[in-house]
From Swiss-Prot:
Pathway: Carbohydrate biosynthesis; gluconeogenesis
Phylogenetic classification of the source organism: Bacteria, Bacillati, Bacillota, Tissierellia, Tissierellales
Gene3D superfamilies according to UniProt: D-3-phosphoglycerate dehydrogenase, domain 3
Domain ACT stretches: 150-222
Example GO molecular function: metal ion binding
BP GO annotations: gluconeogenesis
Catalytic activity field: L-serine = pyruvate + NH4(+)
Keywords: 4Fe-4S, Gluconeogenesis, Iron, Iron-sulfur, Lyase, Metal-binding
Cofactor note: Binds 1 [4Fe-4S] cluster.
Subunit structure and binding partners: Heterooctamer of four alpha chains and four beta chains.
Family to which the UniProt record says this protein belongs: Belongs to the iron-sulfur dependent L-serine dehydratase family.
Descriptive protein name: L-serine dehydratase, beta chain
EC code(s) of this entry: 4.3.1.17
Organism name: Peptoniphilus asaccharolyticus
Superkingdom per UniProt: Bacteria
Amino acid sequence: MTDYSAFEVMGPIMVGPSSSHTAGACKIANVATSIVSNNYNQVEFQLHGSFAHTFKGHGTDRALVGGILGFEPDDDRIKTSFELAKQAGLNYIFTTTNLGDNYHPNSVKIVFSYPNGEEEYVIGSSIGGGAMKIVNINGIAIEFRGEYSTILLEYPEQRGVISYVSSLLTGSEYNIESLNTKKNKLTNIVTLTVEIDKPLTESLKSAILGVERFTTAKYVEV
């Protein structure tokens, strides 16, 4: 018999109508803004699966825009997120797409465009009960759920990186909730994802994110 928590049975506190289509969507967009650079001038929401079919009726569209604006799922401002985005000068568009069978039906690819013509994107999936997971960042397959503060690092395959990061964290009395690596066999680039039990101090941010060996170093605080 499977045990369920009260949260899983009752769902999160949120602006409705659907925990999957609004709360999860809002969280995806909110976390995505912590991953990319912050000087984007347009956001495109590419909706996949059931998101693509029901995004207007279920409020997914307003929840996504609200998440980009930094709102939490229980923030009443989600109801007026379109109007607030206009006031903030945020340009956004919605399109539908097929990301493929490997993606959860409630998935969205959020593309951030910058004044210099460059783009970044984040793919996230709403997996029920207001929970979500980020599954791809700029073509790198990863998985984290935004439940813990998370360090994201990319680097050419080499020894000592994991021990360097983990020793810094444990030496500063951090608990590592999860640590995962994925390697691109074509480029030998490794993606390291580390979830920790509390936010990084400024000194640890510098010690970890400021190291030259990392081609990408990002931090998402929860």
